[in-house]
Swiss-Prot record:
The lineage of its organism: Eukaryota, Metazoa, Chordata, Craniata, Vertebrata. It comes from the Eukaryota. The modification Omega-N-methylarginine is found at R54. This is Pinin. The modification Phosphothreonine is found at T124. Transcriptional activator binding to the E-box 1 core sequence of the E-cadherin promoter gene; the core-binding sequence is 5'CAGGTG-3'. Capable of reversing CTBP1-mediated transcription repression. Auxiliary component of the splicing-dependent multiprotein exon junction complex (EJC) deposited at splice junction on mRNAs. The EJC is a dynamic structure consisting of core proteins and several peripheral nuclear and cytoplasmic associated factors that join the complex only transiently either during EJC assembly or during subsequent mRNA metabolism. It comes from Canis lupus familiaris (Dog). Belongs to the pinin family. One of its GO terms (cellular component) is desmosome.
Amino acid sequence: MAVAVRTLQEQLEKAKESLKNVDENIRKLTGRDPNDVRPIQARLLALSGPGGGRGRGSLLLRRGFSDSGGGPPAKQRDLEGAVSRLGGERRTRRESRQESDPEDDDVKKPALQSSVVATSKERTRRDLIQDQNMDEKGKQRNRRIFGLLMGTLQKFKQESTVATERQKRRQEIEQKLEVQAEEERKQVENERRELFEERRAKQTELRLLEQKVELAQLQEEWNEHNAKIIKYIRTKTKPHLFYILGRMCPATQKLIEESQRKMNALFEGRRIEFAEQINKMEARPRRQSMKEKEHQVVRNEEQKAEQEEGKVAQREEELEETGNQHNDVEIEEAGEEEEKEIGIVHSDAEKEQEEEEQKQEMEVKIEEETEVRESEKQQDSQPEEVMDVLEMLLHVAVKNVIAEQEVMETNQVESVEPSENETSKELEPEMEFEVEPDKECKSLSPVRENASALEMENEPEEKEERESEPQPEPVRHLQPLPQPEPEPELQPEPQPQLQPEPQLQPQLQLQLQPQPQSQSQPQPQLQLPLPLPLQPQPQVQAQSQPQAVLQPQPVSQPETLPLAVLQAPVQVIQEQGHLLPERKEFPVESVKLTEVTVEPVLIVHSDSKTKTKTRSRSRGRARNKTSKSRSRSSSSSSSSSSSTSSSSGGSSSSGSSSSRSSSSSSSSTSGSSRRDSSSSTTSSSESRSRSRGRGHNRDRKHRRSVDRKRRDTSGLERSHKSSKGGSSRDTKGSKDKNSRSDRKRSISESSRSGKRSSRSERDRKSDRKDKRR
């Protein structure tokens, strides 16, 4: 390390000597010592020279010039002042007055009297020339004057040509001197700049060398200290303590060797760090020198460009003065070269701009593609979410259906015997028809299952409303809506074989009389001549309640039915020997007793309608089958008596009224019996179709289907017996010609009373909802 310190010290001394030489060169060039501290004013003057100085120095210099009086004043003040300006305005006013005065004078002056004067004779040019030719003295005089004028003009011409030549020479000499002076000045500036740069570089080298010397000295001191410590044993704990024993043993000898190894490793690491630090310090000035060289190259190029521009300007001036065509051609060539260079630069810039625009367009396209992909992913994810929701709804619906079936089985087993006894009183003549359970299972769509799941959730609320109402509500108007004809692709299924009745038109009148809420209120009575198209198609159960009355009324605004309704197959319905004129079906929605209606017209689905409504309603109503059948017997008897009284009061002849009442009562009972039988058959078909797909509930469903078959057979036999008696009664009612008009009147009256009752029912429902809230 001692050798390294010596070498560094030698380098430092050499650098100091070179710095001294640079300072001497600067002193020769500038005439002053760069190490001397200059006064502030002199420094500002030096900085504000040509091309140098900025900021406050230049401002102070300007102030100095303005104070000395050599330069222009700081602010040109108006010496004359405001009075002179006002006086100028006054002058302009006076001038304007003087201009306007002559006009006024012309107006004021009186007109002069006209006078006739003889004109003087003008001498012609010929007369004048003749007079001059006659005078010889005048000729001589004119010649002398002309000669003098020509001589003076020639002298002026000669003098002007000589002056222009001298001026041209002087201008050329001055231009050359100026160019030389500029070159010398630039050289001096470059030398001065280089000298100062050398001085800075030398100073940085000196600083680095001084730092290196200091580091080397510190390293030497550290090495000397550690060389003394290496003979001792170092403790493993920190802070490290160095000790030595008076008597050495092999264990202590091992400890000394270990400590020496550790210390030597520490010395080597410290040496490596020292060498790396010195290398870094040497690399820094190299980088600075490289940057300085680059700056010098740039400056040299700028100087060359300025010199070339100066030469081109000199050539242009010479060519303007001398008018040499050859030089003109050279200047044009030089200008063309410059224009080409400028055009190349412009073309390069345009190419760069085009490349940038292309890059931007590519980026925009990539962004648009990414956005489109994201939108597609979102669209793909949306149907997946919809399918998940549908699966959840189906799962919930299946659970609810299983639970309801278990409850229905228990209720139906208990109510088989009393329901058969009670329904036997109500059953009237009915047509036989077949039900296909396999088609029912196939025709049901998952959309209907979703709707059934939603309606199953609403059924508990309806049960609570039924429990809260001890008295039945007034009659509701149920209007069948005409269903639009389905698409031609759907083929109608084969018609069932029906037993026609020759004498009576195929209409069944269902009379249902509500139980009075109070004794003072009148009991509205409604009649419905409803054609029952009996279809082999799977049908929805619609159990008629004692408060619901079906009326065929003309609908002013036909409603658009859902897609499930439009897809239902069309069937030509033939009943009692009468073919309906139009191939339309009137979908009637089954109305629940406690259901709140917002619209004035309630759409009700009867047994004659297709599979448009879901199975959930029929299942929900199957629970209350026994209670409804009990009330049906009393309602049928009361409806028959009320129908006789109403028809007799509205008709003109007593014979026609009695026949009409008997026919209406028979038709109403037959309609109710048909609905009961059809609902039982459809429910049995549904149970059969479901029992096939569910293996774990086969035993229970088998028992239930057997019970229902028994009920169906007994109901059909009774309907056959009652149909004969009903047909004989209907023949008597058909003899009267005016029966149809009377029926229409009764329908209109019943519709009015039903509308009133439905409005009062809405008010009660709204009151109940408000109380619950």
